[in-house]
C-alpha cells in the first residue's frame, strides 16, 4: 500500500467527513479508497469481451405488456449458463423490478443485458459489472457429480 497526499476543498472534505460520521467508515482513507475504486470502475469502458465478470442486471418492466414475461423467460432460459439467480419484486399493480445476478464472459453478459433491456415493456434497465479476478472463474458446462 502506498501513502499519498491529497489537497481537497473544504466542501468536499465536509462531505467525506459526513460519510464517516454516518458510521459507514472508520477513517478518511477508507472512504477515499472506495470512492477511487468506484470512480475508476465508472470511468472504465465495457468489460473485456473475453474476461470473466459478475454482474447485476436491474430492470423494471410492465408485467401486463403483451407476452413480455414469456419473452423474458425464454431469453433467460436460452442463456441459462449466464444466470446465477434472480429476485422478483412487485412494485405496484403493473410494474415489477427484477434483479438478475449474472456470471460469464464480459461480452456475453453485456449482450445478454442489452437484449433484456431492449425488450418492449422493459424500463429503467441498468447493468452493474464487477470485473473478475482469480476468485471469479468462468462458468463451465459440465457437472461435478
Swiss-Prot record:
InterPro entries, A to Z:
Acetolactate_synth/TF_NikR_C, ACT-like_dom_sf, Arc_rbn_hlx_hlx, CopG, CopG/NikR_regulator, Ni_resp_reg_NikR, Nickel_NikR_proteobac, Ribbon_hlx_hlx
The entry lists its GO molecular-function terms as: DNA-binding transcription factor activity; nickel cation binding; sequence-specific DNA binding
- Keyword list, A-Z: DNA-binding, Metal-binding, Nickel, Repressor, Transcription, Transcription regulation
UniProt keyword Transcription, yes or no: yes
Q: How is the cofactor bound?
A: Binds 1 nickel ion per subunit.
Provide the residue positions that the database annotates as binding Ni(2+): 77, 88, 90, 96
The Gene Ontology biological process terms listed for this entry are: response to nickel cation
Family, similarity comment = Belongs to the transcriptional regulatory CopG/NikR family.
Output the HAMAP family linked to this UniProt entry: NikR
Q: What does this protein do?
A: Transcriptional repressor of the nikABCDE operon. Is active in the presence of excessive concentrations of intracellular nickel.
- What's the protein here called? Nickel-responsive regulator
* Originating species: Edwardsiella ictaluri (strain 93-146)
